[in-house]
């Protein structure tokens, strides 16, 4: 030995340390000092040179102090079984082209803040045990405080089981570490590791574990060093940052941690810093057999990055607030599921301009604290959270140029909003659910994909800003807040379209539910689906200009939720069009405009049923913001007020588009209905039937009104009011009405009040009017027109009054007037017809028939006139004519009832130039009215001219008190035609009162 005994140490030792070709002898050192007790050399020790053959240490142990130990050879440096070399200074072993060969448990220790360097490879050799261990410690406190280890080459062989490198300052790794197929081995790098070359730690033969207790950095050469950590069943743990650039470290090259195989767990504390990547190149961590991949910290990688774990469970564990990111490289979570430990508040995954693919993400508990921030270019997301534990995750923010959703997203914390920004594609049926705590859900971008999308925000607002289902990829279905469940009250906002004008963007589409208290806002212009559209809310706002809804023969429903209201409000100058082909269209609330000076139009079109409440009116109060209204359906159900206004408002901006109402289809009055175009003078047109036991009021101002179908033909309506004086209407618009009722309905309407003294004309184009008490009023002239021209036009009132006021009735050629009011009054101002039409007039009641100052007929207009009444009042003339042959041959005047003459009345059945003189027949008495109408007594005179026609007077004339006439003329015109015999039963009461108190002229020559 050298210096083994106490006090025998050398102060320096040099053995063949001169480099030269002659210094080649092998050197064997049995023992230097006493290991663990005393240093054999207390100073510099230099043994061998680059040409030395081998240096072999004996088994006695070797201890140095006080100076650097340098062992150099051109061949191997060989230590015996379980050798120990210890110093308190630097140690350098340089085997040249050979290796450091050790066996058993080889310990190399420096106890000072010094460096241990092995310049070449380190090779475990078979000493008969086949279990070798390499332990190198440098630094005070057993390497915990300082010290440096530099491994210049590789470590390992098939006999190596364990490698332990410990140093507090740095552990420089210059080559691979390879562990043999020996169970329970370990590779422990205890201290800051520095890669001075590409390093592979290969321990995949058995269950050897790999542990780095501190950082792993690159050296300062400028060349990125690659790192591979490879185990079989053994675990891998890196407790420090890989590429710790945030603390003066240097980024490494590529990283491969059990990417190809290995079932052990992987635990990593981070890669890089928050601002700089910790490596350059590809990063592959884990594989499909990895039992658990544990991540905690920042993982900023510099290349395409893949994370994998066992595909059968939640085996990617995030155990602390964590950021996983790249600047411009893809991040792929390939297999396994991410499991976030309870209490973690923030997880960020950001691939920058690279793509991002995720696996399912879950939480561990119910603390609802984790916020997820997911960003990338093309982002693919699977499940987040769990349907049976929605409170695993707090909030979610996903941002990408494109976002592929292929699963369900559930959140449940106090800030459980879900924000998705980017063009969304549905890769699978997708649920987005924040209903547990009512967080808002916002998709900022378009949504496409032939899958189901179900969004549930509870009491929060659900928003999609972009178009839905465009580009040929319509959704299979769209449900937003459609669950009829307690707490699901949130509104819905769609900022874009569903589909296009030519292609559907979704199949079944359901927005809102009966519990929705919020507003559904639709700001797009096209809502085209291939299935039902169902919208349910307390209010609806359509924000787009010229909004169109379309389906493939499927319904569109705007349904009022339990919160009430349900009005649909259009934006300023935003027209509404709905075309469902054959699907029903239903509005549970009113359709309103926006009061910004520009009226809008409403067009609803289907062969199915259109059901509306008020349009352009909030209840019954007009908003003056709706222009034209066109409702087309197989059936149109009305239940409210339709009110229109001029396009462009009033004043200088007033346009010529007046605000027409056009209703095409069989109308059912589901409630009291008012059509009001009076502020604009727009037209009102019904092209088909009107039924239903409710009142109908039409007020058109100067606009024309057309009821082109039968009113009340199947089910009697309530009261009918059209521009009526009784309702203080003063509009002058013309009115056209087809039949009211038919032969199967006794009364097809209640009271009917049509027109006022300004009404230009009333055209009754049907042939039957079975109605209640009625008044038809038009401006003076022949302006109440009966135009059927195919026979009788019947007014059949069951004990209800009928009045034609303000204007004469004008019969189109071929039209006969037949009216019967039961026991109530029947009043006409006058009746006219076409020249040579010879049409008939029959007015019947057991009450009073009144013919006003317009009289009946002129020239050859009227044929027979029959007036039947409990009393008959004549205020105007009656003129009839006959052709003498055929159906118009006579021209008779028949009075069946007591006649009162009120004014100067002329009855003429002898029209010059006609082929026949009709008869005049009074069935009972004739009396004068004798009442004051203008402050003085009127003159009540009667003139009867029958020519050759028979005159029958069956009762007295002026016999009762006050019944006298003021004049009486009967066939007093001298002429060859005036040949009829005259019989006068009684005039006055002899001896008591005069029947005529004025001129009486009866007969001629």
Task: List PLM regions with ranges.
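Extracellular lectin-like interaction modules
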Residues: 1-1005
């Amino acid at each position: 030995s050298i210096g083994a005994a106490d006090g025998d140490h050398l102060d320096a030792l040099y053995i063949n340390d001169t480099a030269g070709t002659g210094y080649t002898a092998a050197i064997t050192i049995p023992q230097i000092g006493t290991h663990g007790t005393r240093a054999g050399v207390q100073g510099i020790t230099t043994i061998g040179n680059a040409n030395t053959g081998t240096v072999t240490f004996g088994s006695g142990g070797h201890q140095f102090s006080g100076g650097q130990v340098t062992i150099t050879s051109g061949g191997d440096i060989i230590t015996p079984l379980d050798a120990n070399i210890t110093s308190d200074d630097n140690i350098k072993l340089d085997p040249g082209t050979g290796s450091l060969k050790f066996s058993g448990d080889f310990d190399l220790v420096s106890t000072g803040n010094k460096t241990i360097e092995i310049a070449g490879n380190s090779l475990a050799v078979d000493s008969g045990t086949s279990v070798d261990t390499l332990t190198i410690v440098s630094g005070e406190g057993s390497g915990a405080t300082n010290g440096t280890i530099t491994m210049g080459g590789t470590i390992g062989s098939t006999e190596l089981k364990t490698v332990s490198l410990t140093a507090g300052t740095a552990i420089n790794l210059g080559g691979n570490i390879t562990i043999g197929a020996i169970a329970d081995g370990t590779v422990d790098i205890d201290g800051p590791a520095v890669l001075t070359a590409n390093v592979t730690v290969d321990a995949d033969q058995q269950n050897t574990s790999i542990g780095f207790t501190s950082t792993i950095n690159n050296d300062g050469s400028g060349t990125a060093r690659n790192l591979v950590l490879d185990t079989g069943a053994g675990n891998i743990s890196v407790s420090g940052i890989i590429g710790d650039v945030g603390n003066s470290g240097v980024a490494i090259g590529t990283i491969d941690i059990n990417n190809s195989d290995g079932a052990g767990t992987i635990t990593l504390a981070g890669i890089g810093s928050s601002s700089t990547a910790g490596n350059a190149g590809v990063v592959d961590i884990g594989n499909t057999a990895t039992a658990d991949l544990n991540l905690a910290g920042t993982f900023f990688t510099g290349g395409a990055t893949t994370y994998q774990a066992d595909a059968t469970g939640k085996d990617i564990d995030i155990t602390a607030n964590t950021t996983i990111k790249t600047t411009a490289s893809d991040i792929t979570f390939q297999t396994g599921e991410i499991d976030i430990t309870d209490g973690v508040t923030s997880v960020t995954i950001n691939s920058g301009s690279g793509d991002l693919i995720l696996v399912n993400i879950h939480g561990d508990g119910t603390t609802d604290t984790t916020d997820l921030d997911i960003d990338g270019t093309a982002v693919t997301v699977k499940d987040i959270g769990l349907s049976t534990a929605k409170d695993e995750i707090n909030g979610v923010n996903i941002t990408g140029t494109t976002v592929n959703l292929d699963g369900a997203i559930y959140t449940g914390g106090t800030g459980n909003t879900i924000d998705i920004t980017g063009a969304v594609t549905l890769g699978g049926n997708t649920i987005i659910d924040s209903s547990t705590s009512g967080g808002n859900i916002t998709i900022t971008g378009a949504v496409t994909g032939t899958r189901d999308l179900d969004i549930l925000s509870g009491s929060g607002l659900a928003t999609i800003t972009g178009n839905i289902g465009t580009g040929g990829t319509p959704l299979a279905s769209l449900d937003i807040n459609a669950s009829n469940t307690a707490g699901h009250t949130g509104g819905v906002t769609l900022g874009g379209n569903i589909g296009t004008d030519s292609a559907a963007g979704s199949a079944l589409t359901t927005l809102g539910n009966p519990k929705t208290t919020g507003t559904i806002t639709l700001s797009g212009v096209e809502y085209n689906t291939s299935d039902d559209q169902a919208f349910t809310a307390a209010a609806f706002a359509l924000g787009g200009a010229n909004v169109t809804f379309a389906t493939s023969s499927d319904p569109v429903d705007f349904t009022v939720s339990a919160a009430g209201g349900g009005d649909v409000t259009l934006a300023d100058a935003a027209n509404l069009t709905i075309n469902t082909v054959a699907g029903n269209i239903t509005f549970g609330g009113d359709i309103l405009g926006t009061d910004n000076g520009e009226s809008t139009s409403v067009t609803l079109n289907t062969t199915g049923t259109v059901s509306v409440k008020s349009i352009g009116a909030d209840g019954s109060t007009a908003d003056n913001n709706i222009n034209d209204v066109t409702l087309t359906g197989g059936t149109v159900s009305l239940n409210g007020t339709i009110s229109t206004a001029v396009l462009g408002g009033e004043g200088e901006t007033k346009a010529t588009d007046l605000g027409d109402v056009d209703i095409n289809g069989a109308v059912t009055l589901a409630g009291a209905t008012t059509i009001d175009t009076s502020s604009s003078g727009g037209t009102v047109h019904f092209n088909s039937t009107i039924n239903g036991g409710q009142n109908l009021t039409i007020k058109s101002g100067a606009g024309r009104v057309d009821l082109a179908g039968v009113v009340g033909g199947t089910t009697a309506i309530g009261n009918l009011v059209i521009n009526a004086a009784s309702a203080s209407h003063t509009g002058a618009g013309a009115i056209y009405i087809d039949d009211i009722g038919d032969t199967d309905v006794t009364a097809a309407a209640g009271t009917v009040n049509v027109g006022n003294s300004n009404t230009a004309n009333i055209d009754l184009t049907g042939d039957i009017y079975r109605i209640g008490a009625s008044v038809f009023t038009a401006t003076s002239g022949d302006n109440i027109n009966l135009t059927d021209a195919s026979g009788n036009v019947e007014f059949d009132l069951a004990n209800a009054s009928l009045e034609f006021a303000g204007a004469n009735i004008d019969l189109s050629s071929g039209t006969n007037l037949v009216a019967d009011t039961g026991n109530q009054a029947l009043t006409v101002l006058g009746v006219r017809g076409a020249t040579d039409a010879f049409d008939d007039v029959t007015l019947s009641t057991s009450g009073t028939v009144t013919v006003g100052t317009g009289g009946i007929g002129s020239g050859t207009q009227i044929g027979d006139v029959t007036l039947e009444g409990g009393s008959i009042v004549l205020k105007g003339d009656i003129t009839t004519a006959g052709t003498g042959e055929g159906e118009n041959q006579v021209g008779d005047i028949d009075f069946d009832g007591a006649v009162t003459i009120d004014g100067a009345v002329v009855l003429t059945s002898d029209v010059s130039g006609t082929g026949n003189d009709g008869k005049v027949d009074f069935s009972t008495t004739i009396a004068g009215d004798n009442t004051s109408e203008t402050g003085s007594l009127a003159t009540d005179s009667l003139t009867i001219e029958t020519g050759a026609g028979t005159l029958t007077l069956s009762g007295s004339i002026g016999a009762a008190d006050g019944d006298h006439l003021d004049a009486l003329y009967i066939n007093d015109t001298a002429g060859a035609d005036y040949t009829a015999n005259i019989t006068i039963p009684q005039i006055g009461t002899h001896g008591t009162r005069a029947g005529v108190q004025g001129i009486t002229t009866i007969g001629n020559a």
